[in-house]
Amino acid sequence: MAEAAVLAWVRGPGTAWKALPCASVGCSVRDVIYRHCEEQEIPVECFFVKCNGVLVAAGDKVCHGAVYSLEPRLRGGKGGFGSMLRALGAQIEKTTNREACRDLSGRRLRDVNHEKAMAEWVKQQAEREAEKEQRRLERLQRKLAEPAHCFASPDYQRQCHEMAERLEDSVLKGMQAASSKVVSAEVTETRKRPNRSKTDQGAGAKKKRCFWLGMEGLEAAEGSSTGSSDDSEDDDHEDAPGTSGPSCCARENGSDGGEVAADSPGSVQSSGSGTRSESPKELQNPMTEPGQGILENTGTEPGETSTREHNERKTVTVTETEETPARKETESPEPTEKGQETGVIGEDRAAMALSGEDRKSIPAATPEGSNSGDTALGVEALDLSAFSCAAELELLGLERLKCALMALGLKCGGTLQERAARLFSVRGLSKELIDPTLFAKPSKGKKK
């Protein structure tokens, strides 16, 4: 008995059911699908076979009456999306902020949390208002507990009235005092008008205390002013003979100044050079000392003494202006003798400024060797061991201190006190022990 043929149903893409008989009972699924694809002219590699929804291997035997469906293969991607999901899952596990996530209804957790917080705040609004009102009441109670100022007290009213009365009294007294001062000032002005000449003379005397050089052009004007005041001067000299001594001496010296200058030119030259070497303070002392002596010795009134001082100063200025032409005529052309006399006179005056033992202790300035350059510049060295303090060195003057500092090679600038202190600080020290900061910097030659 011949074996019955096996019949298989194939369902392909785009085609209906189709029955395919097999040549033998042991034919495989590959043979059936291959024959069907050849008939339909479609590639076999693009399909896979399913039977009852289950993949069938190509080597399996065909079952009779079974339905085999051809499923087309889908073109898949490169892959890698799974790795991205794994990385995102790791980040989600690490973070603690879930507000960007969504719940099962699709709402973000951020919005849900905000709604919950708003509901809680609305519930607590009444409590906050109650607490605010409680704090306001407590603040009012604290203020009411403090003692209140009573402005209706009788003591306060009485003090206010007394203060107002005192203010009115003080204003009235001030107005009365001001009016009385104005009246008294007018009366004193009318009484003192005739004596304005004396006050003007006193002011002029104060202004003429300065010593001015080069006043030869005012000789005629000064002579006329002194001639007009001779009558008043004679009366004053007769009343106070002690005060007329300096003026008389000045007049006699002024009248005989030309003869003395002609007879002894050397004395005039030495005196002229001595006056030039004096400091401004020494020049002002002769002008102020006679006035002081007059006030101490005489018991006259201040107004009379001021007029006498003024007249005496006029006579002194006249005699000085008369002596200046004689000095110019008798000046010698030799500068060396004049410089020596000036130095001797300056030393004598410095010695006279000291008192007692200090005069003996100050030695005369001794110049260094003639071969040194400092001697050519007039630099002198002092015996610092003869001075006991810096104040004694200040009496030598700025120029002497400068010369002494230059002789030692020290800085020679600064005020009188600074120079004296700098010079006194190196007393008894050798050149190696002196502070290097005190030495003057060497002068740099000009670059060619």
Curated annotation (Swiss-Prot):
One of its GO terms (molecular function) is damaged DNA binding. Residues 1-77 form a propeptide. Residues 266-277, 295-305 have a biased composition (Polar residues). The record marks G77, K78 as: Cleavage. Residues 178-208, 221-372 are annotated as: Disordered. The PIP-box (PCNA interacting peptide) motif mediates both the interaction with PCNA and cleavage of the SDE2 precursor by a deubiquitinating enzyme. The SAP domain is necessary for specific binding to DNA. Inhibits translesion DNA synthesis by preventing monoubiquitination of PCNA, this is necessary to counteract damage due to ultraviolet light-induced replication stress. SDE2 is cleaved following PCNA binding, and its complete degradation is necessary to allow S-phase progression following DNA damage. Plays a role in pre-mRNA splicing by facilitating excision of relatively short introns featuring weak 3'-splice sites (ss) and high GC content. May recruit CACTIN to the spliceosome. This is UBL fusion protein SDE2.
